[in-house]
């Protein structure tokens, strides 16, 4: 067992970066303590830092790299588009092709709009829900992460939880006065909130699986009861599938659990690793978006040709090669073996996950945000560093999900499991 890894070049780069970039990183989840490693390259299941260290990667850019890094099929699609130009400011045939493919997999989507990020997707979806319903309020789940726009940064997951900053300075109270919250997996509290506010309640937005505070899974029947509740009260249901979309199945969580929302947001995988976001829904809702309707949304890079080309390539490959069968089988295997390791060691830890998402929780299995907060964050961080020293890169936060890619080999999996045995 290796006790530490040499990161001299990364440390030097971090010292320089801190003088130019706040915190030395471009997103707070990358701010590994005492300093992050800086990536030089990545290929397949491996990622390499400036010091030449190589790691088996289960972070996978926080989800998008479902085929692994630098996949030849995606790279070929991007190169082909680069030869034709990479930004036009006009519609393209490619975006129509990708829109048709996405709508074919998601029964909740009759029409959709491309944006550049998941944050834009959820921000636009909520604006549209309010515009369509002529109502102001919405409900989000405690610990649900829907990007970094003002209305949703209330008890959000992801880096905000890790840093102990569930809210953010710079957001006037008036911006969130229409943001209501309910605990995950608590249909009784949700029912009370919905029924009390239904006259001015536009939508409920939810990650079907809480991916930035776990993963935490829905209890049996929870999503179906939520769907029934929102329908009965004339409230839109929005599934934020930025993480679960094309991850659990081609049709995401709504296919996996058999629940169809009114609107869906997507990101990460659907762009093949390039910047993209999608929001879509029923035709009568989506036709409210400009220029068809009076709800405004626009973006210079929306429908970016390279992102769309990469998206077409990854979706076609996932379907043709039946990738989800392998991914989900590997996920089942890893969760089972790590659970055995935890039991054999007599540890009070829990292995959580679904499909190709998994995580070891340093505490009891959580079913909501408040239960997740009881975990041993410092204990997990120490474990993260031990795994990194032994060539396994897990997300540095207790609250970020591990992902499996199609590039992870049997050898990768067995080496990883050996590292779990040695470092738990």
Swiss-Prot record:
The modification N6-(pyridoxal phosphate)lysine is found at residue 268. One of its GO terms (cellular component) is cytoplasm. The keyword Transport does not apply. One of its GO terms (molecular function) is pyridoxal phosphate binding. Its main location: cytoplasm. It holds the Pfam family Aminotran_3. The keyword Cytoplasm applies. Pathway: Porphyrin-containing compound metabolism; protoporphyrin-IX biosynthesis; 5-aminolevulinate from L-glutamyl-tRNA(Glu): step 2/2. GO terms for biological process: protoporphyrinogen IX biosynthetic process. Its EC number is 5.4.3.8. CDD domains: OAT_like. Keywords: Cytoplasm, Isomerase, Porphyrin biosynthesis, Pyridoxal phosphate. InterPro entries: 4pyrrol_synth_GluAld_NH2Trfase, Aminotrans_3, Aminotrans_3_PPA_site, PyrdxlP-dep_Trfase, PyrdxlP-dep_Trfase_major, PyrdxlP-dep_Trfase_small. It is an enzyme of class 5 (isomerase). It catalyses: (S)-4-amino-5-oxopentanoate = 5-aminolevulinate. Its cofactor is pyridoxal 5'-phosphate. It is found in: Cytoplasm. Belongs to the class-III pyridoxal-phosphate-dependent aminotransferase family. HemL subfamily. NCBIfam families: hemL, PRK00062.1. This is Glutamate-1-semialdehyde 2,1-aminomutase. It comes from Methanosarcina acetivorans (strain ATCC 35395 / DSM 2834 / JCM 12185 / C2A). The gene is hemL.
